[in-house]
Amino acid sequence: MLTSRHWSPTSSRPHAEGIEGNALRYGLFYGADIDNVAAMLRRRMLPVVRNGGEIPFIHHEDAAAATLAALHHGRAGRAYNIVDDTPATFRQLVTGIAEHRHAPRPLVVPQRVLAVAAPYGKALFGGVSMRVSNARAKNELSWKPKYPSISDGIQAQ
């Protein structure tokens, strides 16, 4: 357990003699939960915005494989982006799940509706693009996503 003695007054990073680590920055997880998403679509409970930004996703199996790779090959003090190869919008993810599970396509709502109903959702899915590279993880961890896109990951479920 990290306690106050592990924190330097001049740094925001923990430190302890003989302990090294790295940081894994995961994309948004998806995978085995797609049946829950399809159920929400059937009840018309999962709207999307028309022009959302691209965000990084990661299939849960790929996240687990990357975590193991980091334990074996990760370099101390390094940060790794654990994301697939193809950024996508939340709308693309939800629409792909709808098609794969034969559920209704999501309702498309204006961003201002999402801002009122779900401010955090609007901030995350409503236009902000967060494109990141997984090149360091691939090179240094000897890892690559089994599902390089949300389309590949959805089809595997």
Residue ranges and their predicted role:
Residues 22, 56, 86, 107, ...:
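Residues that recognize and position ribonucleotide moieties
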Residues 36-62:
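A conserved pocket-lining segment of Rossmann-fold NAD(P)-dependent short-chain dehydrogenase/reductase
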Residues 1-23:
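Catalytic helix-loop patch of NAD(P)-dependent Rossmann-fold dehydrogenases
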Residues 64-67, 73-121:
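Mid/C-terminal beta-alpha module of Rossmann-like enzyme folds, strongest
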Residues 1-8, 53-57, 87:
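Short-chain dehydrogenase/reductase
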Residues 5, 16-19, 28-39, 61, ...:
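Glycine/proline-rich active-site loop of Rossmann-fold NAD(P)-dependent oxidoreductases
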Residues 91-95, 115-144:
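Conserved C-terminal active-site "lid" loop/helix of NAD(P)H-dependent oxidoreductases
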Residues 148-157:
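Amphipathic terminal alpha-helices
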